[in-house]
């Protein structure tokens, strides 16, 4: 709703990135939404989702990495444990572009290209465990979010995800007119 009020594309990007994560990482083959993903991978908190500056430089090259890391607040000290960084946007794209003396369009190209490269690299890592329990209430919230995103963005895949998840919950999580709260391993309770 922040995007609808402000028309600031930053908020639209946050919605799109969040829903892309949910669709990619947190959606069951049947269409329901899983409940959680662990923070630990390989016994280390945040390892799957965090980056050392050197990793980014190796993947993107020095010039693109410098722009990418400035946009996402990556520093040698890191903002997480052991010098690792969680990517997060510190300032508006246009403001960062102005400081770096590049056009907003150029910076956006570097950011989008870098996101794809880092996502591909991250998918080569050992992923954290996922709690594959499907909770009815949380699915209701996600169905609502997907439907709302479709209304605002007009992207058909959000509507499709909402419909598939709603169908899944109605077919698998309602028995004798009663809502069942959890679904796991083919069983609803």
Spans of model-derived segments:
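Glycan-recognition and catalytic cores of secretory/periplasmic carbohydrate-active enzymes
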Residues: 1-189
């Amino acid at each position: 709703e922040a995007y609808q009020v402000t028309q600031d594309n930053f908020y639209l990007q946050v919605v799109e990135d969040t829903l892309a994560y949910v669709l990619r990482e947190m959606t069951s083959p049947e269409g329901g939404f899983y409940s959680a993903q662990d923070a630990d991978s390989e016994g280390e908190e945040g390892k799957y989702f965090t980056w050392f500056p050197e990793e980014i430089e190796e993947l993107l090259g020095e010039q693109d990495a410098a722009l990418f890391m400035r946009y996402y607040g990556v520093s040698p000290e890191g903002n997480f444990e052991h010098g690792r960084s969680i990517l997060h946007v510190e300032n508006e794209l246009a403001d960062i572009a102005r400081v770096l003396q590049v056009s907003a369009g150029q910076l956006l190209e570097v950011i989008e290209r870098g996101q794809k490269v880092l996502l591909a690299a991250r998918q080569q890592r050992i992923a954290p465990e996922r709690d594959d329990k499907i909770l009815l209430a949380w699915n209701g919230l996600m169905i609502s979010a997907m439907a709302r995103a479709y209304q605002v963005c007009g992207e058909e895949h959000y509507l499709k995800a909402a419909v598939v998840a709603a169908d899944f919950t109605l077919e698998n999580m309602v028995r004798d007119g009663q809502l069942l709260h959890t679904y796991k391993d083919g069983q609803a309770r």
